[in-house]
């Protein structure tokens, strides 16, 4: 998940949630500095040892009249011993000023990147990123329900075809509301220009879970970023 928003970026779980068999749909409202920016909507289907997911982030309300933004992504892969193994990733984004589209195809020997952008020397080699999740898989991995044994302990890498980041949870504490608040660090590893790196390398984030029996369900995700970070 790229850092695509500024200042205080907050995802708040919307109570609208659907489940059709093994297909689950989740909706989060997106806020910046207390103002509703848009909505993240994604669905995941688990079948045997495979998963498929699709989601979109769109600006809504007053913000959409000022700066329209849309991000769509889909991913398919396998689950091996609880670990996501992507096989295909598609992404399309429109910031109002720039449109982008990319596809990642995963093979035994490496990853094939399809994009119209001209490669830069600092881009990460896709064939060296087989251990990393694609952005859509990363969204699922962060926002899915957790158990007591693995909550606040997630640690993985993400690769979007150009950039590699590490997402690491470092600790957690119970809040006065009886929720669990986990702290994590989003670290830029490679694929960024020198100018981009001046905006920062490490970005803290927080995930709040509601505890239901032995399940921990995300109710909010918060990240504070530099105004130009991504």
Please report, for each region that a protein language model flagged, where it lies by residue.
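Sec-dependent N-terminal signal peptides
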Residues: 4-12
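C-terminal segment of classical bacterial N-terminal signal peptides
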Residues: 12-18
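A generic signature of intrinsically disordered, low-complexity regions enriched in glycine/proline
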Residues: 18, 129, 135-138, 149, ...
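Acidic, serine/threonine-rich low-complexity disordered tracts
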Residues: 20-106, 144-230
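Surface-exposed, polar helix/loop patches in the mature regions of secreted/periplasmic/lumenal proteins
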Residues: 85-139
């Amino acid at each position: 998940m790229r850092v695509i928003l500024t200042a205080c970026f907050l995802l708040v779980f919307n109570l609208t949630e659907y489940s059709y068999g093994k297909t689950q749909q989740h909706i989060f409202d997106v806020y910046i500095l207390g103002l509703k920016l848009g909505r993240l909507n994604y669905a995941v289907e688990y079948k045997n040892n495979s998963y498929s997911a699709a989601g979109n982030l769109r600006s809504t309300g007053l913000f959409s009249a000022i700066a329209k933004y849309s991000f769509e992504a889909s991913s398919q892969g396998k689950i091996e011993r609880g670990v996501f193994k992507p096989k295909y990733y598609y992404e399309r984004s429109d910031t109002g000023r720039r449109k982008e589209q990319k596809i990642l195809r995963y093979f035994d020997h490496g990853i094939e990147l399809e994009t119209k952008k001209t490669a830069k020397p600092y881009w990460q080699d896709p064939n060296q990123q087989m251990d990393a999740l694609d952005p859509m898989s990363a969204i699922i991995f962060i926002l899915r329900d957790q158990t007591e044994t693995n909550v606040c302990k997630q640690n993985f890498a993400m690769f979007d075809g150009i950039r590699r980041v590490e997402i690491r949870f470092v600790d957690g504490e119970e809040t006065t509301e009886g929720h669990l608040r986990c702290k994590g660090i989003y670290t830029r590893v490679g694929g960024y220009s020198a100018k981009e790196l001046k905006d920062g390398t490490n970005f803290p984030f927080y995930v709040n879970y509601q505890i239901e029996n032995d399940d921990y369900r995300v109710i909010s995700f918060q990240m504070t970023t530099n105004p130009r970070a991504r």
